[in-house]
């Protein structure tokens, strides 16, 4: 409002549908007549689903992704015009130790060594790192945090003061976001981990890709746009590898920092 970010809680009463014995203007895809019901708030609707989930032949219809219902009702126009400069979008990337091999989200035993975010609008970069670093760039702010506890504490304190609307980055949905959430929970506790969301709503889930189960985290109030998914969807060309190093070489002619002279990644970062 007036060019300033603000949060507002808007009460919303979703619409659901149930079978109707009378003729109505609403039908399911199979032709079944249905009528509107309004159980109440979003929480009331969820309770309504639970109440009748074990009742035979009692079907509940409608979009149970209530965020989309709200957007559809709030902005009925075909195209929603927006100013991207008013949307706080950041790119996020983390680096971890590799004491026991490549970091794994499920076990999440490797410590976080660095977290970097870049603001899409200002292009400013902020890094929290565990090693001393001599910074001579005006577009970079480096925060030296000797321990992971200090690093995560400093990061989440900053994050809570300026939570972005959108997070992007390469493979963030399957690695960076769930890894940060799990390390925050393990090192600082669940209460501070949930502050990763401006609403305090962080929930764990699973996705199944190519026969493998992956852990994901939904961060309420923050949209995750995984650059890997966007690249696959909008380039219309299959690549032999989707490792960031390979894609950077294909698209930019550049590669990640070479550390082949070291026997292990641990030798490189220590």
Describe the predicted segments one by one.
Residues 1-230, 234-270:
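The two-metal-ion catalytic cores of nucleic-acid processing enzymes
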